[in-house]
């Protein structure tokens, strides 16, 4: 279109013949050389979702390192955790970060627990005798939780996020709980409609048709191999190939973390999370961006497909 407009421009028509041909040739070459960059839109789309952001300092410094690379990504923040404000302050600096609310109803780490944003007295059916969230999905589902208290607490987490100054795109369930029963799923969908947010899941049943891949349960020794295998087998038909990651720096703080739900993570969560961070920072991953696949976020998917 630009070339056609140029040809009809009176100034172009006044150029000597040879200069016209030279200019047209230059424009065509530039257009050709620019084609691979434009063609990035035809590549499979990969969506990196980083969970548990705001959980502790080691997680926050890890997401800061990812953000500094400039790659687009989605970050699910736990607004019920003590370190959430640091995560907010970090991610405000990076427009490449898309923000989600990691809806939290459990506190799974031994000797490092958190409770409801609303306060223990406001949602007594959601907490243990010490006022903390229950330690596991099973414990939560077997408890006499009240749906109206779940709604009150999750609404408070979303409103804390919306009031943080970050632009929030979506909500997703920590440990899958907020989507784990028909009643909880209906409630989460209600909240998404109320606050005009998308929903990301922790299963293969997704809202935007994105494929689901999770590195969490993979042994440290084979994590990167699995990650690269996912990238070697991307679906071009899916709106996005989502990869859920849990990252952190292997610091003394993270080394002391003990997941009460997983023997694999009970004393090795630090190495798991450092390995997943290393995968995303690796040259072998970074060299494939915009060549083998295009990185997108939930903000992009919502823009492409709408909220419903």
Model-identified regions with their sequence ranges:
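Structural preference for beta-strand elements that scaffold enzyme active sites
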Residues: 45-47, 72-76, 96-102, 168-172, ...
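A short alpha/beta connector and helix-capping loop motif
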Residues: 57-81
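Catalytic domains of cell-wall/extracellular-matrix polysaccharide-remodeling enzymes
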Residues: 144-236
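Active-site gating loops and adjacent loop-to-helix segments of metal-dependent hydrolytic enzymes
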Residues: 113-140, 258-268
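Boundary/entry segment of secreted carbohydrate-active catalytic domains
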Residues: 39-64
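Acidic (Asp/Glu)-rich catalytic clusters
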Residues: 63-69, 86-98, 116-128, 163, ...
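C-terminal domain-boundary segment and adjacent tail
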Residues: 199-202, 262-308
């Amino acid at each position: 279109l630009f070339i056609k407009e140029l040809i009809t421009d009176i100034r172009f028509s006044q150029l000597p013949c040879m200069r016209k041909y030279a200019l047209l040739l230059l424009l065509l070459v530039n257009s050709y050389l620019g084609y691979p960059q434009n063609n990035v839109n035809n590549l499979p789309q990969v969506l990196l979702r980083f969970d548990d952001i705001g959980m502790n300092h080691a997680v926050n410094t890890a997401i800061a390192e990812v953000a500094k690379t400039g790659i687009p990504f989605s970050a699910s923040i736990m607004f019920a955790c003590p370190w959430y404000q640091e995560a907010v302050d970090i991610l405000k600096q990076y427009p490449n970060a898309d923000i989600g609310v990691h809806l939290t109803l459990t506190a799974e780490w031994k000797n490092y627990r958190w409770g409801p944003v609303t306060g223990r007295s406001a949602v007594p059916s959601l907490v243990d005798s010490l006022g903390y969230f229950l330690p596991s999905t099973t414990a939560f589902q077997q408890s006499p939780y009240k749906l109206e208290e779940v709604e009150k607490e999750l609404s408070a987490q979303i409103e804390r996020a919306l009031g943080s100054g970050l632009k929030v795109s979506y909500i997703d369930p920590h440990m899958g709980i907020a989507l784990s029963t028909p009643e909880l799923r209906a409630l989460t969908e209600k909240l998404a409609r109320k606050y005009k947010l998308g929903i990301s899941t922790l299963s293969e049943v997704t809202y935007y048709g994105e494929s689901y891949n999770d590195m969490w349960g993979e042994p440290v020794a084979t994590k990167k191999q699995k990650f690269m295998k996912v990238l070697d087998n991307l679906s071009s038909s899916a709106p996005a190939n989502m990869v859920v990651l849990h990252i952190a720096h292997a610091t003394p703080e993270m080394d002391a973390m003990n997941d009460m739900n997983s023997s694999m993570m009970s004393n090795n969560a630090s190495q798991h999370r450092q390995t997943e961070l290393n995968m995303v920072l690796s040259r072998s991953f970074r060299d494939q961006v915009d060549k083998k696949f295009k990185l997108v976020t939930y903000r992009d998917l919502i823009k492409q497909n709408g909220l419903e």
